Every structure is written in C-alpha cells, then in structure tokens.
UniProtKB/Swiss-Prot annotation:
The keyword Phosphoprotein is assigned to this record: yes
Function: Acts as a ventralizing factor during embryogenesis. Inhibits axin-mediated JNK activation by binding axin and disrupting axin homodimerization. This in turn antagonizes a Wnt/beta-catenin-independent dorsalization pathway activated by AXIN/JNK-signaling.
Axin-binding as annotated region, ranges: 123-190
Subunit structure: Interacts with AXIN1.
One term of GO molecular function: phosphatidylinositol binding
SUPFAM superfamilies assigned to the protein according to its UniProt record, in alphabetical order: Domain from hypothetical 2610208m17rik protein
Pfam families noted in UniProt: Aida_C2, Aida_N
Protein family according to the UniProt entry: Belongs to the AIDA family.
Source organism of the structure: Macaca fascicularis (Crab-eating macaque)
Protein name: Axin interactor, dorsalization-associated protein
Amino acid sequence: MFSSYRLARHLQKEAQAQHNNSEFTEEQKKTIGKIATCLELRSAALQSTQSQEEFKLEDLKKLEPILKNILTYNKEFPFDVQPVPLRRILAPGEEENLEFEEDEEEGGAGAGSPDSFPARVPGTLLPRLPSEPGMTLLTIRIEKIGLKDAGQCIDPYITVSVKDLNGIDLTPVQDTPVASRKEDTYVHFNVDIELQKHVEKLTKGAAIFFEFKHYKPKKRFTSTKCFAFMEMDEIKPGPIVIELYKKPTDFKRKKLQLLTKKPLYLHLHQTLHKE
C-alpha cells in the first residue's frame, strides 16, 4: 500500500513536469498521470473496510506492460480514469473552477454567506531568520483550505511543523492565528509562515506538515480535522495546492489515507529568499 502510494506520487510529479524538464511527450505524461490515478485507487481499495474492492489486484497487473513500454505504448488506456494529479502547481493568477459534491463521509454543508471569525490570540508565529550568504530562507503563505463543511469549523487554525523521516521536529512548531474568514467551501488564512531553518540545512527526507485544527464545543477540546504535507522537492517559488489526509497525523508518512475523493486542497504560496 505504501509502495503504491509512493510510486503514484513520483508518477504524478513526472506527469506535471514542464516540457523542457521531462523526457516524455505530453501524451505519454497523460498516460503516466492515468497510471498514477489507478495506483491511488488501488491504495484506497486496500485501506477500505468494505469487502468489494473498487480496484482489484488483477486490474493493477494490467498496468505493468503499459508502464514497461511507456515510450511505445499507443493503445487505448484500459480504465476510464482521468490523469488528474493530486498536487497541481497553479500558474500565478490562475483560478480554479471546481464543482464540490457532498462528501458521503461527513454530514453538513459549508456553503453560505461570507463570515468572519472573532479576534483571538494571534497564534505563535515566529519572525524570519537572519539571512546568511548563499543560504535560502522560505516563506510559506497559507492562503486557504478547501473543506466541504468549512462553515461549521469553530476557531480553526493550522499548526505548522518540520519533521524528519522519523517524525522528529527539526524546527520550532508554529500555530497560525485563528482563520480570518470562511466563505463557501473555504476557510481563509492569508498568513505567512517563516521556516525556522535555512532550506539547505534541512535533512534529506524532511517534510513540512500542516495540521488543520478546530474547536469541538460538544467535546470541549480542539481537534485535528486533517493534515497535509510538502516534501523538499516541492519547495519552489510560486503557488502550489496539496492534498489533504485523514487524521491522525502520520509524521512518518507510512499509512496515509486521503481525506476525500473530492477536489479539496490546501492552497499555499512559496517565496524563496537568498542572499
């Protein structure tokens, strides 16, 4: 399951590669994207508690000859899937036009009139580190998160941490202030996070985690609703949207399960500072 997920991620990244940086044609990248989608479906089937799997092992085996002969494959793809990469890097100013369906797993709807959250304690954000010659600092602007029940979240905020492969903190943990507003299926933050370590000093395999938390009045505690993460090879200037995973937060990235099949993401914008 984990290997299927990993392979899917690598294929998704290759499918998104700019033409100049890829050895594949656009048609081949489309096929690679479809294979990645199938791997995600297989991973989801393995994690499903239902007896009937949506994507069987026999189906998975049909992909092997396609992947082995990707440079010469010119037949119709055996499965009706779309090559939609889970991580889509948006061009500056590009707008998303996504239709949101109701999620079967969680009740309630987030659509409604724009609303603002009350002023609260301003989180635990830290200032940018001093610059060093030849070293790169990263600012991540958390713009918004897409959730079907965004309108029902009380006092939502995001905890940001940087972990190594063993889940050990590499920098101080930071909490954003409570979100600035909610609108339709989005919770808006528009807040900058200053990474508390130069990018070049991060260990291999490190990842930046974003845990979305909200208050549950019935249980009287703050709960993690979902999380997302960004790996080191995804540190690039500009916008990026990353997928959301079900809690509990898996800092070791070994048993990941998508929050929903719907097009709901965490929207970020990265700025690199180098002397």
